[in-house]
Amino acid sequence: MVKYKILVATGDSVFAGSANLVHLWLVGEHGEADLGKQLRPLLGRKTELEVDVPLHLGRLLAVKLRKQKGLLDSDWFCKSITVQGPGTQGEAFFPCYSWVQGKETICLTEGTALKVTDDTQNLFRKYREQELENRRNVYRWGSWKEGLILPIAGSTERDLPRNQRFMKDKDLDFSLSLVKELKNFAIKGTLDFVSRVQKLEDYQKVFPHTKTALPERVRGSWKEDALFGYQFLNGANPMLLRRSMRLPARLVLPPGMEDVQTQLEKELKAGSLFEVDFSLLDGVKPNIIIFKQQYVTAPLVMLKLQPDGRLLPMVIQLQPPRHGCPPPLLFLPSDPPMAWLLAKIWVRSSDFQLHQLQSHLLRGHLMAEVISVATMRSLPSLHPIYKLLAPHFRYTMEINTLARNNLVSEWGIFDLVVSTGSGGHVDILQRATSCLTYRSFCPPDDLADRGLVGVKSSLYAQDALRLWEIISRYVERMVELFYRSDTDVKEDPELQVWCREVTEVGLLGAQDRGFPLSLESRAELCRFVAMCIFTCTGQHASTHLGQLDWYAWIPNGPCTMRKPPPISKDVTERDIVDSLPCLQQARMQITVTKFLGRRQPVMVALGQHKEEYFSGPRPRDVLKQFQEELAIMDKEIEVRNASLDLPYEYLRPSLVENSVTI
C-alpha cells in the first residue's frame, strides 16, 4: 500500500461549498487509483484526506474529480488540490479555479506548465486534446452585429459558461448598486418632468456627490480653454489627440482668416500643432428620443501646445465641408464667449460618443473578450501562455453580455438618452472596427504614431509607456522560462492556432491591419502577449476610470444635443441650455455614469490575483518581481500627483483592475 496526503481547497465566495460528496481519482504514469467518495467540500475550507493506494502510480500526472448527485444538488467551486506522496517530488499542485457541476468529470493536470513539444512521451496529449474539444463546445463564437468583432455565444448571461459568471459577492454588489441607482433615478426623476433647465447652473440639480475632488473642479472650471485642452491629454478619452504633420484637408479657411492660417502654420512648423478629428461621426444617423430629433456633428479641433505644457484650442470646425456648400463656420477663442462655449460643448458631446463606443467599449471591453474567448478555445490549461493570461479574463464575458443587453441594445441606455442611439452607435462601432490596428494597441507604437512621446504634460502617455514596459518585462521573464529559442515559438502548434484564432476569427481577419497570423520569435510572442494583458488592464482602465470625474457635470460631456449646431455666432445662454440634454436625460446620464464609473469594492488590482495557475518557485518569483515593480510605479505616481494641480490616477497600478469587470 502507498500512502497519499491530499488537501482540497474550496472557494470562499458565497455558495462555493457543496452538500454533495466528491469522488476522487489519482492518475499516474503507471495507472489510476479510484479513491471513492471521500470528500464533502466546505465553504472557504481546506479539506485534508489521507488515503492508501494499492498500486504504485509512478509520477503523478492528474487528479480527476466528480461531484455525486444527492437529494440536494449544488455546484462546488474548487480552487486547487495538493497531493503529497510517492511520485510528487515532495508535493504536487493541481490548480482548478472552476465550478464542478452535475456529474461532469473534471481532470486537473499538475500545475507545471508544458508545451506540446515538452511532452515527449505524450503523457498529457489526451488530456490536452479532450480539454480543448470540450472547451470549443462550451466557448463558441457568437455574432452580435454584422461587421463587429466576435463575442462569446449566448443571448444572456445565463447562457455563459459557469466559470465566466460573476461570483456571488460580485453579483450581489452589481445588482444592489444598480437597484440603488435606479431607485434614486425613479424618485428624483419624477420631478424632472415638471422642471426645465433655464440656465447652465440648473444642472447642479443632477450633479452627484462624489468621493473625489475632480468632478467639483470640472464643474467650476469647465469653460476654461486650458481644461478643455487638458482633457484630450489626460481626460476620460486620451486616445484621439495627435500631432499635426500638415494642415488637415478638411480645414477650409475662408477669406479674412489669413491671420489664423499664419498662426496655424507657425505652430505646425514649430511642431506644437495638434488636432482631434471626429470624422468617424460624419454621416451617422442621429437618434430620435421621445419623438424629438437629436443631433450629431463631426468636429475638428486644432490645438497648440504651449511651452508650459498647456494645450489650448485655436480653431473649431463643427462639420466637414460639403461639395457645393459654403465652407463651414469656424469658431475661434476670440469669438463671442457664448458662441465659443457652444462650439466647445459640441466637441465635448462628440468626444462622449467616441469615448464610450470606440475607446471604451470596442477597444477595451470587446477586444478583451476576443482575446479571452480565443484563449479558452485554443490553449489548454497546461499551456504556459494560458496560465499567464487566465487571471486577466475574470468576469469579462458576463459584463460584456450585460452591456450588449442593457447599454447598446434595442431600447437600451443608448437608445433612450444618447444622440447616437437607435442604430447610430452600431454604425460607429462598425466604422471604428476598421481602425483597430495592431500598432494602436501597443502604447510605444501608438504614442509614437500620434506624436505624444516626450510630451511632458501628457501624463497618460508617460504612465501608459511605463506600465507597458513593466508588463513587457513580466511577460519576457515568464516566456524565457518556457521558450528557450525562436524555434520553440515557431514549433508550438497550440500557440500558432491561438494567434490565428485571435486575428483571423475573433477580429474578422485583422491581418491587413497588422495583427499577426503567426508568431515567429520570442520577441513577437512577448509583444503579442503584452498587448493582450495591457488591453485587459491598462487600456480599459485609462478609458473607464475617468467617467464620473469628467461626465458628472453634464455640460462638460453631454450624452446628446437637442438642437442642430449653430450656423451663426449669435448665441445666447438660452441657445446653449436648449441644446444640452433635458433634466431627465441628464439624470439618466448621471445614474449610469455613477453606477459604471464608481470604484469597485470587489476589485483585484493589476498583478494581485490570488489564483496560482503555475506551480514551482520560478514563475512565482517572476510574478513577485512584477508586483514589486508595480508597487514602485504606484508610489511614484502618488508622489508625483501630490504636487500636481490636476492629479492623473487612471493608470495607477493599485487602481487598474486585473481584468475588464465593469
UniProtKB/Swiss-Prot annotation:
SMART domains: LH2. Catalyzes the regio and stereo-specific incorporation of a single molecule of dioxygen into free and esterified polyunsaturated fatty acids generating lipid hydroperoxides that can be further reduced to the corresponding hydroxy species. Shows increasing catalytic activity within the series arachidonic acid < 5,8,11-eicosatrienoic acid < linoleic acid < 8,11,14-eicosatrienoic acid. PROSITE patterns: LIPOXYGENASE_1 (PS00711), LIPOXYGENASE_2 (PS00081), LIPOXYGENASE_3 (PS51393), PLAT (PS50095). Fe cation binds at H360, H365, H540, I662. Transmembrane segments: none annotated. Changing V453L: In strain: FVB/N. The keyword Cytoplasm applies. It comes from Mus musculus. One of its GO terms (biological process) is arachidonate metabolic process. Expressed in epidermis. The lineage of its organism: Eukaryota, Metazoa, Chordata, Craniata, Vertebrata. Its EC number is 1.13.11.-, 1.13.11.31. Residues 115-662 form the Lipoxygenase domain. It holds the Pfam family Lipoxygenase. This is Polyunsaturated fatty acid (12S)/(13S)-lipoxygenase, epidermal-type. Residues 2-114 form the PLAT domain. GO terms for molecular function: arachidonate 12(S)-lipoxygenase activity; iron ion binding; linoleate 13S-lipoxygenase activity. Changing P617S: In strain: FVB/N. PANTHER family: LIPOXYGENASE.
